[in-house]
C-alpha cells in the first residue's frame, strides 16, 4: 500500500523547474521515467505532464531513504521534497536540463507493475495494445502535448465566439431518428416499449430551432454519433464545433469563420492565416483537381483534351467524347524516366476507380514514346503535348470515360503521384480554400431518386430555385466547405427558412407530404412562426486538432478512441448485457446465422 500525502503539497511541476528556482525548497510529484545508480548516487527522472526533472539522492541521506530510492521501478508514482540546485552535467536537450532536485524526503505514493508499453515518444507498440492500455499511452509526452493543444484550441474557439456575440448552448443527446444519410445509433426507451431515441449525427435541427427562438448566435462543442463503416480517419463518436447565425448571408458566415480560423491558428501555433481565404466553385474544383476537397499545396491540374482529340484516329478517345464523356490528362513533370512496370501499376490504380485504363505519353530526349502514338498524326500529337503544357522529360497520363469516372480517377491519381513523388515540398504549409456552389442534389441511379448532397435543409441558390420542378440536378446550393491541405475541415450552408420551400425540397427527395411531416413536422411547424434567415457551419474539432498537432491519426487526438470496427479495447465495448435488462426494455436479441460453407 502506498504512503499517504498527509498534508504534503506539490508546489512546482517537474517540467517547470528552471535556474530561477535554484536554492528553493520544493515538492514535486509524478511518475518515474527511469532510475539508475551512478557512482553511489541514485538518479531518478521524474515525469509529470509538464516534463521531466532529474532527482538526485546523495549518499549522505541515510541508508533507509537510499534503499527506498533504489527500490523504485519505472512508473512508480512518488513525491519528492528537496532543493533545486544547479546541475553539474547540463543536458541541453531538456528544458529542465540546467537544474536538478537534490532530494531530502521521499514518499512512494503507489507502485507499478512492469508496464506493457514503454512510456516514450517513439513508441512502436501495436495499436491494439496502445488502446487497451490507453491510460499508459496517454502518459507519453507527445500524447500529453496533443491534449494540451486540444485544450488551447477549444479555449481559443470559445474566446473568439464569445467576443463575437455567440451564446454556448446545449442541445439534446436523446432525440428523434430522422434517417437520411448515415445510420443512427438507437437507444431503446423503457417507458415507451418498442420505441427508440437516436443519438444525434449533428445538432442541425435544434440549432435551427434556436434561431427561430431568437437567440441570434449559437455555438456548441458537441459530441455527434454516426453508425457507419469506419474509414481511416473516422470514429463512431466525434466532436464538432457547431455554430449558427441569424440574419446573415453566405459571405457573413464565411467571414466570421475565417476570423475564427485565423484566431485559433494564431493562438495555438503562432501561425498567421491569410484572409480572406481564396474561393473555388465545386465545378472548378472537380474539373481542375477531380475532388471537392483539393490539395492546393502542389499544382498538376487536370487538363481537358476532349476538343483536341474528338476527331482523332484513336477510337477510345473519340467514343468517350461522342458518348458525352471526356478525355482528360495530367502532366507529371520529370516523369518520362518512369519505367513501364511503374506506369502499368498506375494503370491498375485508376481501374480501382472504374476507369477502363490509362493512356500515357513519355516525352524523352530521343522523342515521343507511347503505345497510342501510332493513332495520331504528328500535328495531333503536338497539339496534345501543347495543350498539356508538357516539355521534354515529362509524362502525360490520360483517362477517357464518362466525366464522373474521368475526374474521380485522375483526382485520385493526382494524389497518388503526389505521395509517390513527394510533390508537396513544404509540409508545414497550411493551404486553405473555400469550396462553394455545390450541387444541391445527387442522383442515385440504383434507387432512382435524388438525395441531398449535404442535408435536406440547405437553401438552393436564388437563381436556381426555378429548376426544382423541371431539372433538380441543375440546382446549386448555398453551401460552402472549408478545405485545408486536401481535407475537409468544416462545412455549412444557408438554411431554408420557409415552410413551402422546405416541403418542396422534401418532395424532390421523394418524401410524401405525410412522411415529411411525420419526420420533420416539428421543424415545419416552427417555420410558421416568423423564422429569421439563418445559416451556419460545423468544424470537425478532431480533424482540426490533427492539423494543429501534426498527426495523421485521428485516434491520437481522442482520449479513448474506438478501433476501425468501432470496438473499444480498453472497456471491451460493445458488450453483451444482462437478459433482465433486455427484458425490461422489451428487446430480444437474434443470433446471426453462420453463413460460412
UniProtKB/Swiss-Prot annotation:
Region (Aspartate): 204-207
The entry's keywords: Aminoacyl-tRNA synthetase, ATP-binding, Cytoplasm, Ligase, Nucleotide-binding, Protein biosynthesis
Gene Ontology CC annotations of this record: cytoplasm
UniProt GO MF annotations: aspartate-tRNA ligase activity; ATP binding; catalytic activity, acting on a protein; nucleic acid binding; transferase activity
Location of the protein in the cell: Cytoplasm
Positions bound to L-aspartate: 180, 226, 454, 495
Pfam families found in the cross-reference section: GAD, tRNA-synt_2, tRNA_anti-codon
Predominant location: cytoplasm
Catalytic activity: tRNA(Asp) + L-aspartate + ATP = L-aspartyl-tRNA(Asp) + AMP + diphosphate
EC number: 6.1.1.12
Top-rank taxon, per record: Bacteria
Coiled-coil parts of chain: none
GO biological process: aspartyl-tRNA aminoacylation
Binding positions for ATP per the UniProt entry: 226-228, 235, 488, 540-543
InterPro entries the record matches: Aa-tRNA-synt_II, aa-tRNA-synth_II, aa-tRNA-synth_II/BPL/LPL, Asp-tRNA-ligase_1, Asp-tRNA-ligase_1_N, Asp/Asn-tRNA-synth_IIb, AspRS_core, GAD-like_sf
Its biological purpose: Catalyzes the attachment of L-aspartate to tRNA(Asp) in a two-step reaction: L-aspartate is first activated by ATP to form Asp-AMP and then transferred to the acceptor end of tRNA(Asp).
Family: Belongs to the class-II aminoacyl-tRNA synthetase family. Type 1 subfamily.
Subunit structure comment from the entry: Homodimer.
Name of the protein in its database record: Aspartate--tRNA ligase
Taxonomic placement: Bacteria, Bacillati, Bacillota, Clostridia, Eubacteriales
The encoding gene: aspS
Amino acid at each position: 500500500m502506498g504512503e499517504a500525502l498527509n498534508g504534503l503539497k506539490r508546489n512546482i511541476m517537474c517540467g517547470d523547474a528552471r535556474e530561477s528556482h535554484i536554492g528553493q525548497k520544493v515538492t514535486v510529484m509524478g511518475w518515474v521515467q527511469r532510475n539508475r545508480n551512478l557512482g553511489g548516487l541514485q538518479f531518478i527522472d521524474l515525469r509529470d505532464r509538464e516534463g521531466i526533472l532529474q532527482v538526485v539522492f546523495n549518499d549522505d541521506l541515510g541508508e533507509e531513504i537510499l534503499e527506498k530510492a533504489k527500490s523504485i521501478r519505472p512508473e512508480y508514482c512518488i513525491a519528492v521534497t528537496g532543493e533545486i540546485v544547479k546541475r553539474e552535467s547540463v543536458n541541453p536537450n531538456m528544458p529542465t536540463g540546467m537544474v536538478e532536485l537534490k532530494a531530502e524526503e521521499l514518499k512512494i505514493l503507489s507502485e507499478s507493475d512492469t508496464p506493457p508499453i514503454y512510456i516514450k515518444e517513439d513508441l512502436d507498440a501495436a495499436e491494439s495494445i496502445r488502446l487497451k492500455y490507453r491510460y499508459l499511452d496517454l502518459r507519453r509526452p507527445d500524447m500529453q502535448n496533443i491534449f494540451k493543444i486540444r485544450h488551447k484550441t477549444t479555449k481559443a474557439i470559445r474566446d473568439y465566439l464569445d467576443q463575437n456575440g455567440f451564446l454556448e448552448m446545449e442541445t439534446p443527446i436523446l432525440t428523434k431518428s430522422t434517417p437520411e444519410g448515415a445510420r443512427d445509433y438507437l437507444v431503446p426507451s423503457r417507458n415507451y416499449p418498442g420505441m427508440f431515441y437516436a443519438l444525434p449525427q449533428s445538432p442541425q435541427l435544434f440549432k435551427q430551432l434556436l434561431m427561430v427562438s431568437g437567440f441570434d448566435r449559437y455555438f456548441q462543442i458537441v459530441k455527434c454519433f454516426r453508425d457507419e463503416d469506419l474509414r481511416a480517419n473516422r470514429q463512431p463518436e466525434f466532436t464538432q464545433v457547431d455554430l449558427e447565425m441569424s440574419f446573415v448571408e453566405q459571405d457573413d458566415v464565411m467571414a466570421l469563420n475565417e476570423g475564427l480560423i485565423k484566431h485559433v491558428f494564431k493562438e495555438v501555433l503562432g501561425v498567421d492565416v491569410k484572409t480572406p481565404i481564396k474561393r473555388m466553385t465545386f465545378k472548378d474544383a472537380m474539373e481542375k483537381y477531380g475532388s471537392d476537397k483539393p490539395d492546393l499545396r502542389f499544382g498538376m491540374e487536370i487538363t481537358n483534351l476532349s476538343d483536341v482529340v474528338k476527331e482523332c484516329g484513336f477510337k477510345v478517345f473519340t467514343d468517350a467524347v461522342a458518348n458525352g464523356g471526356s478525355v482528360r490528362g495530367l502532366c507529371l513533370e520529370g516523369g518520362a524516366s518512369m519505367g513501364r512496370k511503374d506506369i502499368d501499376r498506375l494503370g491498375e490504380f485508376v481501374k480501382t476507380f472504374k476507369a477502363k485504363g490509362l493512356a500515357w505519353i513519355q516525352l524523352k530526349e530521343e522523342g515521343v514514346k507511347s503505345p497510342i502514338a501510332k493513332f495520331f498524326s504528328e500535328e495531333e500529337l503536338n497539339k496534345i503535348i501543347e495543350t498539356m503544357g508538357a516539355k521534354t522529360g515529362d509524362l502525360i497520363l490520360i483517362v477517357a470515360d464518362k466525366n464522373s469516372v474521368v475526374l474521380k480517377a485522375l483526382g485520385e491519381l493526382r494524389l497518388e503521384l503526389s505521395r509517390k513523388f513527394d510533390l508537396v515540398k513544404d509540409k508545414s504549409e497550411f493551404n486553405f480554400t473555400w469550396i462553394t456552389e455545390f450541387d444541391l442534389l445527387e442522383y442515385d441511379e440504383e434507387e432512382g431518386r435524388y438525395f441531398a448532397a449535404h442535408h435536406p435543409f440547405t437553401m438552393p441558390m436564388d437563381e436556381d430555385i426555378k429548376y426544382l420542378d423541371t431539372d433538380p440536378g441543375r440546382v446549386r446550393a448555398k453551401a460552402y466547405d472549408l478545405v485545408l491541405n486536401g481535407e475537409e475541415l468544416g462545412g455549412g450552408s444557408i438554411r431554408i427558412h420557409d415552410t413551402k420551400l422546405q416541403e418542396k425540397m422534401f418532395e424532390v427527395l421523394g418524401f410524401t407530404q405525410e412522411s415529411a411531416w411525420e419526420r420533420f413536422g416539428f421543424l415545419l411547424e416552427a417555420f410558421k412562426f416568423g423564422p429569421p434567415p439563418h445559416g451556419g457551419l460545423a468544424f470537425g474539432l478532431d480533424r482540426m486538432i490533427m492539423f494543429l498537432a501534426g498527426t495523421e491519426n485521428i485516434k491520437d487526438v481522442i482520449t479513448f478512441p474506438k478501433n476501425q470496427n468501432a470496438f473499444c479495447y480498453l472497456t471491451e465495448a460493445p458488450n453483451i448485457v444482462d437478459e433482465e435488462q433486455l427484458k425490461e426494455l422489451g428487446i430480444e436479441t437474434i443470433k446471426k446465422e453462420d453463413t460460412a460453407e
